[in-house]
Amino acid sequence: MTSIAVVGSQWGDEGKGKITDFLGTTADLSVRANGGNNAGHTIDFDGKEFKMRLIPSGIFAAKLGAVISNGVVINPKVLLGELNNLEKSGIDTSNLKISNRAHIIMPYHIMQDTYEEEAKGNLKVGTTKNGIGPTYMDKASRIGIRVCDLIDPETFAEKLRFNLERKNALFTKVYGKPAMDFDEIYNEYVEYGKRIAKYVCDTSLYVNDALDRNEKVLFEGAQGIMLDIDQGTYPFVSSSNSVSGGIASGSGIGANRIKTVLGICKAYTTRVGAGPFPTELHDETGDKIRDIAHEYGTVTGRPRRVGWFDSVALRHAKRVAGINALSLNLLDVFSGFDKIKICVAYDLNGKQIDYYPASLKEVEACQPIYEELPAWEEDITGAKSWEDLPEKAQAFVKRISEITGIPVVTVSVGPDREQTIVLQDPWTL
């Protein structure tokens, strides 16, 4: 069995798309296991750039194709838009598989997301308003509409009518908003069901069969561990489990079928939206990192908050997700800096701690304790091997590995697939 689960080890936007693209060239099957179209990644293929929110990168190269599994919530309009864009560019999409157990994001989920965020006022969490949270809410309430329902017009009509009665009561009586029309939604979405039906199957069987044959299976995690609904900075989190355990359940496989958990991290830290961020920079250094690295959200376009590398948060991610290898991205950003800082612990009301508190109040009171390292002058974007990196850059990478207790297996020195230095092949771990 050869399998890798790629997980974001920070607050998302760590460069998972690049690493999954890099590993996807040698993977036999690529699987998306959680989240929805709130998570964007950019893939460069055959000289063209593709911005994807739902379809895994394996659609481009993997022998067995790409899977959208049961843990994903699917906006069929977004999905079909991505499929159309791929097909217009000559990409074969026939090898896409969609789980019959995945839940569907409905128009009322998007409206509910918007209304609830507006009603929260100062307590809003910065949702992307794509309906992700309300869809997972309905899933947990056991009233959600799944792919297998959408492709059965009779079942779909029954479940839509049941849900819309309740949503319209909520919209009109609580939020003072207009009701939504059954016929309009049904006619639009039943057509979506017809168009995606050919891709639908029991993806749990498909993925497990591939693992049984010892195919190389790449599981593409979305968001980041610090956005996990249980282990992240609650309530400023996503609505799904982004840890490796969530990838297992979201793919319909046993947890012991994931061989390597590859944590993706930047040489610094970023976050989009509200929520605690102990190492955040509010000075020229933060602005400099943001400008050099073009730190703006793939989906939202919002400027990302920037801070120094936080080893406390990463050790937390290691513990709860079982990370046993690291891919360190954007090392090239620090060329020309005088110094780099790594947060090694927190000061919480005069006490040094090395763990990430659950209490939001405690996290906000934490002050980072830094270790300072010298940066390097050289441009490293052309480095092809470990030996090509300056000694100071090597020292920084080694220190990250020492502090976190995780071996660094790849180092990224630029956005292109070729700008990836492999210290150890993740498929051989």
UniProtKB/Swiss-Prot annotation:
Catalytic activities: IMP + L-aspartate + GTP = N(6)-(1,2-dicarboxyethyl)-AMP + GDP + phosphate + 2 H(+)
HAMAP family referenced in this protein's UniProt entry, alphabetically: Adenylosucc_synth
Species this chain originates from: Lactobacillus delbrueckii subsp. bulgaricus (strain ATCC 11842 / DSM 20081 / BCRC 10696 / JCM 1002 / NBRC 13953 / NCIMB 11778 / NCTC 12712 / WDCM 00102 / Lb 14)
A molecular function (GO) term: magnesium ion binding
Residues that hold Mg(2+) according to the record: D13, G40
Protein name: Adenylosuccinate synthetase
Protein task: Plays an important role in the de novo pathway of purine nucleotide biosynthesis. Catalyzes the first committed step in the biosynthesis of AMP from IMP.
Enzyme class: ligase
